[in-house]
Amino acid sequence: MSSGALLPKPQMRGLLAKRLRVHIAGAFIVALGVAAAYKFGVAEPRKKAYAEFYRNYDSMKDFEEMRKAGIFQSAK
């Protein structure tokens, strides 16, 4: 017997399409994971920090401090 009879024939058609299906699905899953990680790891904490800052922010107090420091030329 020859060794060629023991090995199955390799699939020659549709190799690229099969690999693309697998890799596109994997890329989609990775992209969703990265988007979720960014949203909950970066965007949500940033949004909470901005909300907390503006909840306690006094613009007139900030303006008066800048005016006393001499930043403005028109408001002395």
UniProtKB/Swiss-Prot annotation:
Q: Which residues lie on this side of the membrane: Mitochondrial intermembrane?
A: 45-76
Instruction: Tell me the InterPro entries matching this sequence.
Output: Cytochrome_c_oxidase_VIc, Cytochrome_c_oxidase_VIc/VIIs, Cytochrome_c_oxidase_VIc_sf
Superkingdom of the source species: Eukaryota
Report whether Mitochondrion shows up as a keyword of the record.
yes
The record's comment on protein family reads: Belongs to the cytochrome c oxidase subunit 6c family.
Q: What is this protein called?
A: Cytochrome c oxidase subunit 6C
**To which species is this protein native?**
Mus musculus (Mouse)
Key words, A-Z: Acetylation, Membrane, Mitochondrion, Mitochondrion inner membrane, Transmembrane, Transmembrane helix
The record describes its membrane topology as: Single-pass membrane protein
Compartments, as annotated in UniProt:
Mitochondrion inner membrane
Quaternary structure and interacting proteins, as annotated: Component of the cytochrome c oxidase (complex IV, CIV), a multisubunit enzyme composed of 14 subunits. The complex is composed of a catalytic core of 3 subunits MT-CO1, MT-CO2 and MT-CO3, encoded in the mitochondrial DNA, and 11 supernumerary subunits COX4I, COX5A, COX5B, COX6A, COX6B, COX6C, COX7A, COX7B, COX7C, COX8 and NDUFA4, which are encoded in the nuclear genome.
